[in-house]
């Protein structure tokens, strides 16, 4: 029995998650020979795979191939490309593609908004990041843990500790399940502001919430002590 497109998509997705790129490409190239024509989902998985590898040239080549085959990219496709551009520091291209997506009548998802907000913060464009966050809410999207983490990180890196803590408290009030990244991000902000004691208070709170510190947690605290010149405590 021949494998159908759905089966191939599942296989490609599984291989991609394991980082087996050569096998992903081999399966993709085999599909037409086996009578399984790649679908929009197939192309989106492939594009996402290449973007995560930093191979934007191949990702956009597949995007163009899709269009030539009259397969219309969907929100998942755009999300992969925008995230890929953002991760590779190509924020202007990411914003242009976002605008192109809107002009074509596609509605962005929360992943796209969060990715762009993260990119804007990393550019140092805090005002634009908050403006996009407001737009996200107006479009009916609720901030999830990932979005909050991005804002806390962006504010913390800009020295806006009080604002970052306010968002942290807001997450508590909304009953969101804070994760290790949430705590690590705020700890990093406190350590950067030379407030290691506050970072350790967060460590205690983190463990009371049933979250175990990870390598990133300890690296953050050690770096905090080193920055203070307290090498003996580190």
Predicted regions and their residues:
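Pentatricopeptide repeat
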Residues: 4-9, 13, 24, 39-44, ...
